[in-house]
């Protein structure tokens, strides 16, 4: 059986670097980022330098692709123009290129920051309204909406993964609730690329965490079975947390320090707000 060809943008980043060895045996990977190719390409990998803000560079990138894992874009908070260029305009550019190439599947790396202003005391699923905690979070909420549009309008099959924190182990108390081992993310991405019944699925990128703030039933219904748990790393996470100290705003909300940055709102009102369901 011929392996599918999957484009991975943002392949030079931390998440892409962790995913590559976990997906390379299953797919032919076309890796892409703005810089030159790394020195460790595998036989099933090739590199295409491209920029999300340059549409002309994206058509040859997507040519012949069966699927797209879109990790590219600006990955931290910044001013609006800095975030919007790659994360909003760039996302539309790569989605349009995927559509033009006949690419059937898209995995969009959304983020927990699309819902970061929910209190830590509230367990949420994927049917609550978005509550972004930053311009970065706004761009991820936009990305989910754009994937929904492409699924409905052009019959592309999309999965938006609200990634918590991808690492070999969680690094603080907050991450005990949102952490996902790279093995589990690779499993979830594979489901998004291969499950026959996906239209546009929104799921959480999290492992089997006892302290989870999220109901990940949408992922479980698709067959996701995480093999890792943050509880196996509690001692390390809490030791690291002790070095950080308290954050008066961030410790109340799921988005943490993203919520606290430049905060001038009403904490009580935000904690008690009940947004209408979308």
Language model features with spans:
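Catalytic helix-loop patch of NAD(P)-dependent Rossmann-fold dehydrogenases
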Residues: 85, 119-155
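NAD(P)H-binding glycine-rich loop region in Rossmannoid oxidoreductase-like domains
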Residues: 45, 49-86
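Alpha-helical substrate-binding/gating segment
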Residues: 163-169, 179-201, 208
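Conserved glycine-rich Rossmann-like NAD(P)H-binding loop of the short-chain dehydrogenase/reductase
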Residues: 27-38
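Glycine-rich NAD(P)-binding loop of the Rossmann-fold in SDR/ketoreductase-type enzymes
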Residues: 53, 82-93, 101, 112, ...
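Conserved Rossmann-fold NAD(P)-dependent oxidoreductase catalytic core, especially the SDR/UDP-sugar
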Residues: 93-131
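Conserved C-terminal active-site "lid" loop/helix of NAD(P)H-dependent oxidoreductases
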Residues: 208-225, 240-268, 272-273
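N-terminal Rossmann NAD(P)H-binding glycine-rich loop of SDR-like oxidoreductase domains
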Residues: 4-25
């Amino acid at each position: 059986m011929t392996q599918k060809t999957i484009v991975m943008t943002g392949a030079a980043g931390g998440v892409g670097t962790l995913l590559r060895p976990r997906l390379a045996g299953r797919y032919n990977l076309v890796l892409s980022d703005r810089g030159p190719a790394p020195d460790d390409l595998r036989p099933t990998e090739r590199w295409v330098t491209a920029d999300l803000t340059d549409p002309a560079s994206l058509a040859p990138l997507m040519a012949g692709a069966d699927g797209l894992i879109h990790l590219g874009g600006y990955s931290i908070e910044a001013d609006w123009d800095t975030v919007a260029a790659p994360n909003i305009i760039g996302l539309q550019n790569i989605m349009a290129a995927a559509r033009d190439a006949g690419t059937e599947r898209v995995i969009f790396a959304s983020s927990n920051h699309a819902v970061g202003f929910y209190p830590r005391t509230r367990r949420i699923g994927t049917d609550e309204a978005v509550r972004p905690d930053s311009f970065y979070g706004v761009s991820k909420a936009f990305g989910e909406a754009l994937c929904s549009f492409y699924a409905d309008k052009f019959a592309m099959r999309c999965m938006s993964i609200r990634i918590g924190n991808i690492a070999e182990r969680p690094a603080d108390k907050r991450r005990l609730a949102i952490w996902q081992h790279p093995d589990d993310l690779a499993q979830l991405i594979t489901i998004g690329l291969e499950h026959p019944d996906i239209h546009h699925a929104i799921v959480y990128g999290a492992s089997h965490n006892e302290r989870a703030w999220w109901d990940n039933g949408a992922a479980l219904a698709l067959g996701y079975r995480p093999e890792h748990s943050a509880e196996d790393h509690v001692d390390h996470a809490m030791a690291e947390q002790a070095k950080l100290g308290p954050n008066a705003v961030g410790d109340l909300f799921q988005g943490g320090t993203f919520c606290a940055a430049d905060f001038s709102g009403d904490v009580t009102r935000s904690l008690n707000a009940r947004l209408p369901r979308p």
